């Protein structure tokens, strides 16, 4: 069964208003019929009434700023940055206990530089290098005890 996800607009006021739809690739605020600027919590009702699955920043209806995803427990699952709707900057994925699972860098939507995956115990698992979204160079792997493979 598909998750029923409702999008809510986070306002400074205590109430939350239901967000509208996308028009020409921009998120439209149904209260003003204009592209939305601000922070949004996306609620997963299957998890509970106020269970946030995503938190996103928008400017002029386009993702711009931080995007966070959460586990059902409420703990941070991933953190990334967007510029004008395109992934840009460091993206970090986390295990539910908060340990880093993966870290990568994007430049204008393209994977660039070092990508590191970690075991749940925090030890490096794989380190790879990318140029223009393609593997480039040496890939190093480790056993969970930290010894190189």
Predicted feature locations:
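Glycine/tyrosine- and acidic-biased, solvent-exposed loop/turn segments at the edges of beta-strands
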Residues: 11-149
């Amino acid at each position: 069964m598909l998750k029923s996800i409702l999008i809510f607009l986070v306002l400074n006021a205590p109430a939350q208003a239901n967000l509208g739809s996308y028009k020409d690739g921009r998120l439209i605020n149904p209260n003003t019929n204009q592209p939305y600027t601000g922070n949004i919590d996306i609620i997963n009702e299957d998890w509970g009434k106020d269970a946030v699955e995503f938190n996103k920043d928008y400017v002029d209806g386009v993702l711009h700023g931080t995007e966070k995803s959460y586990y059902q427990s409420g703990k941070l699952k991933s953190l990334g940055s967007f510029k004008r709707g395109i992934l840009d900057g460091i993206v970090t994925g986390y295990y539910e206990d908060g340990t880093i699972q993966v870290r990568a860098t994007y430049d204008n939507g393209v994977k660039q530089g070092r990508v590191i995956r970690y075991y749940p115990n925090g030890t490096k698992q794989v380190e790879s290098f990318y140029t223009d979204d393609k593997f480039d160079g040496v890939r190093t792997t480790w056993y969970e005890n930290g010894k190189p493979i």
